């Protein structure tokens, strides 16, 4: 990893500029090797920071605790807005996630059922806080680099879901189905070992490829007038389009998935567990695939995958059409809406637009800012986007309960009475 020092120097050069404006890759001082190592670093951070949570979900560890995890994400990102978290904390936060992984393994093997359940509750909250802080720091660093790395961070987050999903399926073929406290014992052990290895890799790449120090703090203090940033309200007005798009895409996704599709689809049409696995897999795979094209717009066939925030807002408005589509798939007893292929297409389109529209704002928001130019201002706006993403997820998971107020699940057919006289 010989590019580590050179990459850190390149990043330090960007930090030392009085004004910051990302104009794409034109004029980049980073070599292709440095760019590759940095992109791989941010992919690993995104992947490893979400693996712990995705593994818990994949093992079906008390899904209701998901709401606590989302709450932790929101709280941590808001704290990061008002309290400057040192960049050097990034590898320590990733290390904290690896300790939580070991905690799942130890508590599942040696604790009682009640103690394990209590650990899971506490761990989900801590995962939200720690992962939220790690992602906020990483997005701040990536979005203010010479070559915007925010898109690669988003890509890493997308990889996590399909990565854990595929490993889960492979382990089903090789490990014992024995369960302990309702959770597969062998799968929990191996999945969290993989999470720990990913986190260790991410820590190594962070330390070697990123400048996590604040070398220019003294210079910044000496030039307070030059470094005076715009107020939060001015920064919000300058970036409200990106903030709104981040909120909308995440709110709609978590409102519909998995609460309506696949859960209410399964209740209405008695979908088999195998087909449910396929439907969920469609979400994981297409969410993963859609996060890459926006990062590859230098390739001709992908050049139209990034566009202005105005167009993205229009696209998010059109995305609301998924609401009636998902509801019809649950409440209509017709071969078309019961068809597994149609359901997979519906889920794939929701997932593809989710990953795509989550990545674009981090890539284009800097270019559309009118007032914000300084690196510190870009970092604050990047934190705004992370908060919008987490608040969108939080609102989505809570508003999905609205559909319980309406009878969109088809009634079960009445069974013929049993003749007890025979």
From Swiss-Prot:
Binding locations of inosine: 53, 135, 287, 291
Mechanisms controlling activity: GSK4 (5-methyl-N-[2-(2-oxo-1-azepanyl)ethyl]-2-phenyl-1,3-oxazole-4-carbox-amide) disrupts the transport activity at 500 nM. Inhibited partially by 10 uM dipyridamole. Inhibited partially by N,N'-1,3-benzothiazole-2,6-diyldi(2-furamide), 2-bromo-N-(4-[1,3]oxazolo[4,5-b]pyridin-2-ylphenyl)benzamide, 4-methyl-7-[(3,4,5-trimethoxybenzyl)oxy]-2H-chromen-2-one, 2-(1-methyl-1H-indol-3-yl)-2-oxo-N-[4-(pyrrolidin-1-ylcarbonyl)phenyl]acet amide and 2-[2-(2-methylphenyl)vinyl]-4(3H)-quinazolinone.
Keyword Transmembrane helix among UniProt keywords: yes
Segments in the Extracellular topological domain: 60-63, 108-116, 175-185, 266-274, 331-338, 398-422
Disulphide bridges: none
Its membrane topology: Multi-pass membrane protein
Known outcome of mutating residue 48 to C: No significant growth defects in adenosine-dependent proliferation assay when transporter expressed in purine auxotrophic yeast strain
GO cellular component terms, A-Z: plasma membrane
GO molecular function, one term: nucleoside transmembrane transporter activity
Effect of substituting residue 286 to C: Results in severe growth defects in adenosine-dependent proliferation assay when transporter expressed in purine auxotrophic yeast strain
Effect upon mutating residue 36 to S: No significant effects on affinity for hypoxanthine, inosine, adenine or adenosine. No significant effects on affinity for hypoxanthine, inosine, adenine or adenosine
Record note on what altering residue 284 to E does: Modestly decreases affinity for hypoxanthine and adenine; no significant effects on affinity for inosine or adenosine
Record annotation: effect of changing residue 291 to A: Abolishes transport activity while maintaining inosine binding
Outcome (variant: residue 390 to A): Reduces the binding affinity of GSK4 inhibitor
Record field: catalytic activity: inosine(in) = inosine(out); adenosine(in) = adenosine(out); hypoxanthine(out) = hypoxanthine(in); guanosine(in) = guanosine(out)
Effect annotated for changing residue 52 to C: No significant growth defects in adenosine-dependent proliferation assay when transporter expressed in purine auxotrophic yeast strain
Anything else known: With an efficiency similar to that for uridine, can mediate the cellular uptake of nucleoside analogs used in cancer chemotherapy: fludarabine (9-beta-D-arabinosyl-2-fluoroadenine), cladribine (2-chloro-2'-deoxyadenosine) and gemcitabine (2',2'-difluoro-2'-deoxycytidine). Unlike the mammalian transporters, can efficiently transport the anti-viral nucleoside analogs: AZT (3'-azido-3'-deoxythymidine), ddC (2',3'-dideoxycytidine) and ddI (2',3'-dideoxyinosine). In contrast to the human transporter SLC29A1, has low sensitivity to the inhibitor nitrobenzylmercaptopurine riboside (NBMPR).
PANTHER family xrefs: EQUILIBRATIVE NUCLEOSIDE TRANSPORTER, EQUILIBRATIVE NUCLEOSIDE TRANSPORTER 4
Name used for this protein in its record: Nucleoside transporter 1
Gene source species: Plasmodium falciparum (isolate 3D7)
Gene responsible for this protein: NT1
């Amino acid at each position: 990893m010989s590019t580590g020092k050179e990459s850190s120097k390149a990043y330090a050069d960007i930090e030392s500029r009085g004004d910051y404006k990302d104009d794409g890759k034109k004029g980049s001082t980073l070599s292709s090797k440095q760019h590759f190592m940095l992109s791989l670093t941010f992919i690993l951070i995104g992947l490893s920071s979400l693996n712990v949570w995705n593994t818990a979900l994949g093992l079906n560890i008390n899904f209701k605790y998901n709401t606590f995890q989302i709450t932790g994400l929101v709280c941590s990102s808001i704290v990061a807005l008002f309290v400057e978290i040192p960049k050097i904390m990034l590898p320590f936060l990733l290390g904290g996630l690896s300790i939580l992984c070991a905690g799942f393994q130890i508590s599942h093997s040696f604790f009682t059922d009640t103690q394990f359940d209590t650990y899971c509750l506490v761990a989900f909250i801590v995962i939200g806080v720690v992962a939220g802080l790690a992602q906020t720091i990483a997005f701040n660093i990536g979005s203010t680099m010479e070559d915007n790395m925010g898109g690669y961070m988003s890509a890493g987050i997308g990889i996590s879901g399909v990565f854990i999903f595929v490993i889960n399926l492979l382990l089903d073929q090789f490990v014992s189905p024995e369960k302990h406290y309702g959770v597969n014992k062998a799968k929990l052990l191996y999945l969290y070992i993989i999470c720990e290895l990913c986190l260790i890799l991410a820590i190594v790449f962070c330390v070697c490829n990123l400048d996590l120090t604040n070398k220019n703090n003294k210079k910044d203090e000496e030039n307070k007038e030059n470094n005076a940033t715009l107020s939060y309200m001015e920064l919000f007005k300058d970036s409200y389009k990106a903030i709104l798009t981040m909120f909308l895409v995440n709110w709609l996704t978590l409102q519909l998935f998995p609460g309506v599709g696949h859960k209410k689809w399964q209740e209405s049409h008695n979908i088999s567990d195998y087909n449910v696995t396929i439907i969920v897999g469609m979400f994981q795979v297409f969410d993963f695939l859609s996060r890459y094209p926006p990062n590859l717009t230098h390739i001709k066939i992908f050049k139209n995958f990034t566009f202005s925030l105005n167009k993205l807002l229009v696209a998010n408005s059109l995305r609301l059409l998924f609401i009636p589509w998902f509801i019809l798939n649950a409440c209509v007893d017709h071969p078309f809406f019961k068809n597994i292929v149609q359901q997979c297409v519906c889920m794939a389109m929701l997932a593809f637009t989710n990953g795509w529209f989550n990545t674009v704002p981090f890539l284009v928001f800097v270019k559309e800012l009118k007032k914000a130019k300084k690196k510190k201002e870009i970092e604050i706006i990047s934190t705004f986007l992370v908060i919008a993403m987490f608040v969108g997820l939080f609102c989505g998971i809570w508003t999905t309960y609205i559909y319980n107020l309406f009878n969109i699940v088809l009634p079960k057919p009445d069974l013929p009475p049993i003749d007890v006289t025979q």
